[in-house]
Amino acid sequence: MSKKSTNIFTCSGAQHKWIQVVNIDGNIFSIYVCFFVCFFFYLEPSSDDESYEVLDLTEYARRHHWWNRLFGRNSGPLTEKYSVATQIVIGGVSGWCAGFLFQKVGKLAATAVGGGFLLLQIASHGGYIQIDWKRVEKDVNKAKRKIKKEANKTPEINTVIEKSTDFFKKNIVVSGGFVGGFLIGLAS
């Protein structure tokens, strides 16, 4: 891969340094990254007649991973890293997003399933679909037997429930914020 300096965005900073963002291939993602870098470092667009320092985004990205900024070097429990207010905000915002998406997707899924069922009923009533009720009953009984047989073989569910309960107990502040945000997201 050869670097091309496409001069998409040349910026000047507060310390009067000139920075040219180096782009690899000129795609739209790189343009957004260049704009983000200039915005993040409080840079303003400048003219091309000045000298500048070249900043290679690929090299910067290799050295500075986003998860190091988010989680730090030692990513321990949330209770050790953030204050209670920050934990509540993190839980509340993520819960609100999850609740809002759950509400929107739930409405869409319910509409799709209900509409499909309604269309099937109309088609059945109109004679377009003939249902073999004996075969349906046979398949339902077969499924019941399989469920009874598998009911005693589900220790995985118990371990998932135990792990979820332990996580809830260890991170009660974040969990409470998440539940509250989830309910607010469902209501909005």
From Swiss-Prot:
Gene Ontology annotations of biological process type: autophagy of mitochondrion; response to hypoxia
Membrane topology type: Multi-pass membrane protein
InterPro entries according to UniProt: FUN14
GO cellular component labels: mitochondrial outer membrane
Signal sequence bounds: none
Coiled coil segments of this chain: none
Cell compartment(s), UniProt: Mitochondrion outer membrane
Chain positions of motif YXXL: 52-55
Keyword Acyltransferase: no
Pfam families associated with the record: FUN14
Residues that span the membrane, as ranges: 21-41, 82-102, 109-129, 167-187
Annotated keywords: Autophagy, Membrane, Mitochondrion, Mitochondrion outer membrane, Transmembrane, Transmembrane helix
Family: Belongs to the FUN14 family.
Role summary: Acts as an activator of hypoxia-induced mitophagy, an important mechanism for mitochondrial quality control.
Name of the protein: FUN14 domain-containing protein 1B
